[in-house]
Amino acid sequence: MTKIAVLGNGSWGSVLGSMLADNGNDVTLYGNIESVNEEINKTHTNSHYMKDWKLNENAKATGDLEEALNGAELVLFVLPTKAVRIVAKNVRKVLDKTGAKPLLVTATKGIEPGTKKLISEILTEEVYPNDEDKIVAISGPSHAENVAQKDLTAIACASTDEENAKKVQKIFSNDYVRFYTNDDLVGVEVGGAVKNVIAIAAGILVGQGYGDDAKAALMTRGLAEITRLGVNYFGAKPMTFSGLSGIGDLIVTCTSVNSRNWRAGKQIGEGKSLDYVLKNMGQVVEGATTVKAVHELSEEKNIDMPICDAIYRVLYENTDVAEEIKQMMGRDPKPEIRL
């Protein structure tokens, strides 16, 4: 049994926490909405984020970070990208007092705007300076709604330290979620983050009335952009993007109604504004934040990312969706395979 602190008790945090409790671990969920914490502890439900579902009764919740971290051997970050750095700073303060050195695992999929840092880079900076080996990222085709029902899936767990990846693989795996180790930490993170931008584009196509051929073409060219960014900016391995955290996560996020990024894109394709969509979603749309960082990165390194750049313009420069699609299809001819 491993003592685990799950930081973030939204839909994915709650499901992962419950899954880890299913696996026989001692799990404490940390969140800042007291009513959610009380509901989890009293009724083992989280109706604010997950309707008609119960957590494992052994999973506890608290709004006290020190309580959540007390004795934790593994700390799982399942937070919005914008919250990771401030929470990581607070985690460092607690760990400095106790002297504990738990393994840090991130299930957050994003790139921090401004700094353009991956989540593992933020955790390394704020918690374990110069010790990236203690960070593991998990990413793959895994919607909370499906994992909650114990539907089958597979997820990559990546670290620069193979033994730490194997530890996470052993702790997290069960009979409905299979984990595979990977040594390309940044590649796994880039795939998980940037696919959210492509999912917004996929939703926009559906909102505009386009069919399966258009969606398949978009996903394929979107994967090319993700790979290009991962390899040329972050030094990722190209083959990583053919795996669970690349094409696997991209497929499910671009095709499932459970994908909040896809749903947001569909509404934008139907004519809704980004402000309207974000106010009415009730959940974080990570792709809308990540696209800012991706746009900055593509311009900084002159990386060809026409889909991501178009999504940035639609969301933040209010360009016309139909015109962006027209311009995309009228671009100069290019070879299909290039980095």
From Swiss-Prot:
User: Which is an annotated Pfam family here?
Assistant: NAD_Gly3P_dh_C
GO molecular function terms here? glycerol-3-phosphate dehydrogenase [NAD(P)+] activity; NAD binding
Q: In which broad location class does this protein mainly occur, judging by the first location in its UniProt entry?
A: cytoplasm
A Gene Ontology biological process in which this protein takes part is: phospholipid biosynthetic process
Q: Where does sn-glycerol 3-phosphate bind?
A: K109, G140, S142, K195, D249, S259, R260, N261
List the record's Gene Ontology CC terms alphabetically: cytosol
Q: Which residues bind NADPH?
A: S11, W12, K109, A144, R260, V284, E286
Its annotated compartments are: Cytoplasm
Q: Which domain of life is it from?
A: Bacteria
UniProt keyword terms in alphabetical order:
Cytoplasm, Lipid biosynthesis, Lipid metabolism, NAD, NADP, Nucleotide-binding, Oxidoreductase, Phospholipid biosynthesis, Phospholipid metabolism
Q: What is its EC number?
A: 1.1.1.94
Give the top-level enzyme category.
oxidoreductase
Q: Which residues form the active site?
A: K195
- State which pathway it belongs to: Membrane lipid metabolism; glycerophospholipid metabolism
Q: Which reaction does it catalyse?
A: sn-glycerol 3-phosphate + NAD(+) = dihydroxyacetone phosphate + NADH + H(+); sn-glycerol 3-phosphate + NADP(+) = dihydroxyacetone phosphate + NADPH + H(+)
Q: Which family does it belong to?
A: Belongs to the NAD-dependent glycerol-3-phosphate dehydrogenase family.
Function as written in the Swiss-Prot or TrEMBL entry: Catalyzes the reduction of the glycolytic intermediate dihydroxyacetone phosphate (DHAP) to sn-glycerol 3-phosphate (G3P), the key precursor for phospholipid synthesis.
Note the NCBIfam families from the entry.
PRK00094.1-2, PRK00094.1-3, PRK00094.1-4
Q: Which HAMAP family match?
A: NAD_Glyc3P_dehydrog
* Protein name per its UniProtKB record: Glycerol-3-phosphate dehydrogenase [NAD(P)+]
- The organism is Lactobacillus helveticus (strain DPC 4571)
Query: What is this organism's lineage?
Result: Bacteria, Bacillati, Bacillota, Bacilli, Lactobacillales
